[in-house]
Amino acid sequence: MPELPEVETTRRGIERHVTGRRVTSVIVREPRLRWPVPGDLAERLTGHTLGRVLRRAKYLLIEVDTGLLLLHLGMSGSLRVVTPDAPLRKHDHIDLCLDSGRCLRLHDPRRFGAVLWIEGPAHAHPLLAELGPEPLGKDFDADYLFRSTRKRRVAIKQHIMNSHVVVGVGNIYASEALFLAGIRPGRAAGRLTRAECARLVETIRQVLGEAIAQGGTTLRDFVREDGSHGYFQQHLRVYGRTGLACMACETPVKQIVQGNRSTYYCPACQR
C-alpha cells in the first residue's frame, strides 16, 4: 500500500504538471472504486484551472476554484502523467486531460482507491476530520507522543501506526523507525519514557525523510508519476530481512506478527 513517502513523492511529481493547468476533459472508464466516482466529476472539473496539490496523511487534495478533488491510491494505485495517446493498461480507470497536452492517469488494480469531490473545508470531511498530526509537522513532538502513550497497553508499533495518533507511519516505516530508536516493537506504549518518545519522534522523521528523498519504497506496485520506481527498499535496515545479520550488531533479524502485519526487529539492539 502506498504510504506517506509514496504519496508525498506522487504529490511532488504531479504538482508541476497540474498546478495552473486547465482541465479540458475527464474520462472515467471505471467509476466503481472504493466509493463511487461522482457522476458529475467531468462537469465539475472541465474548463476549470487546477491549483496547488496538497497532501493530508495518505490523501492527495487538488485545489479547484469551486472545491477540492480528493484522491487516494488505495492498496496498489498510482498516478502517472502521460500523453493522451499513451497505451492504456488494464486498470487505468480515470484520465484528467489538461491543456498542456498531458493527462493525469489513475491506475488502480484493486479498486480500493478513491476520487471524491469536497465542498467546504477539507478538515471537516469525514475522511480527514479524525486524523492525527503529520509526523513531519511541528505538532508531532516528544511531548505529544509521550502524552498519547500514557496508560496505553497497546504495543508501541501499533500505537504509532494508528492514524488517530499520527498519520502516515506505515508498517515498513514503523519497523525501521523503532529499530533506529532501539525500541522493541512489542513493548507497551505506556512503558516508554519521555526520552524514548523523543528519540522515536526523531527516528520517525528521519526514516520518512529518507524514504521521500529516495522516491518511496517499491515492493510490488508503487510507481512514481513518470512510471519509475522508488528506491528506499535498497536502504531498509530490518524490514524484510528475517534471519539476516543486523547491520549494527550482526544478530539475526527476527520477524513476528502484530495486528496481522509482519514486524521486523533486532532482539539485541531493541529493548
UniProtKB/Swiss-Prot annotation:
Segments forming FPG-type zinc fingers: 237-271
Catalytic reaction annotation: Hydrolysis of DNA containing ring-opened 7-methylguanine residues, releasing 2,6-diamino-4-hydroxy-5-(N-methyl)formamidopyrimidine; 2'-deoxyribonucleotide-(2'-deoxyribose 5'-phosphate)-2'-deoxyribonucleotide-DNA = a 3'-end 2'-deoxyribonucleotide-(2,3-dehydro-2,3-deoxyribose 5'-phosphate)-DNA + a 5'-end 5'-phospho-2'-deoxyribonucleoside-DNA + H(+)
UniProt keywords, alphabetically: DNA damage, DNA repair, DNA-binding, Glycosidase, Hydrolase, Lyase, Metal-binding, Multifunctional enzyme, Zinc, Zinc-finger
Cofactor, free-text remark: Binds 1 zinc ion per subunit.
GO molecular function terms noted in the UniProt entry: 8-oxo-7,8-dihydroguanine DNA N-glycosylase activity; class I DNA-(apurinic or apyrimidinic site) endonuclease activity; damaged DNA binding; zinc ion binding
SUPFAM superfamilies in UniProt: Glucocorticoid receptor-like (DNA-binding domain), N-terminal domain of MutM-like DNA repair proteins, S13-like H2TH domain
BP GO annotations: base-excision repair
UniProt cofactor(s): Zn(2+)
Annotated residues for binding of DNA: H91, R110, R152
InterPro entries hit by this protein: DNA_glyclase/AP_lyase_DNA-bd (IPR015886), Formamido-pyr_DNA_Glyclase (IPR020629), FPG_cat (IPR012319), MutM-like_N-ter (IPR035937), Ribosomal_uS13-like_H2TH (IPR010979), Znf_DNA_glyclase/AP_lyase (IPR000214), Znf_FPG/IleRS (IPR010663)
Domain of life: Bacteria
Alphabetical list of Pfam families matching this protein: Fapy_DNA_glyco, H2TH, zf-FPG_IleRS
PROSITE patterns tied to this protein: FPG_CAT, ZF_FPG_2
Chain segments annotated as coiled-coil in the UniProt record: none
Active-site residue numbers: P2 (schiff-base intermediate with dna), E3 (proton donor), K58 (proton donor), R261 (proton donor)
Enzyme nomenclature, EC number: 3.2.2.23, 4.2.99.18
SMART domains found in the cross-reference section: Fapy_DNA_glyco, H2TH
Task performed by this protein: Involved in base excision repair of DNA damaged by oxidation or by mutagenic agents. Acts as a DNA glycosylase that recognizes and removes damaged bases. Has a preference for oxidized purines, such as 7,8-dihydro-8-oxoguanine (8-oxoG). Has AP (apurinic/apyrimidinic) lyase activity and introduces nicks in the DNA strand. Cleaves the DNA backbone by beta-delta elimination to generate a single-strand break at the site of the removed base with both 3'- and 5'-phosphates.
Subunit structure as annotated in this protein's UniProt entry: Monomer.
HAMAP family: Fapy_DNA_glycosyl
Family to which this protein belongs: Belongs to the FPG family.
Name the record gives this protein: Formamidopyrimidine-DNA glycosylase
Taxon lineage: Bacteria, Pseudomonadati, Pseudomonadota, Gammaproteobacteria, Chromatiales
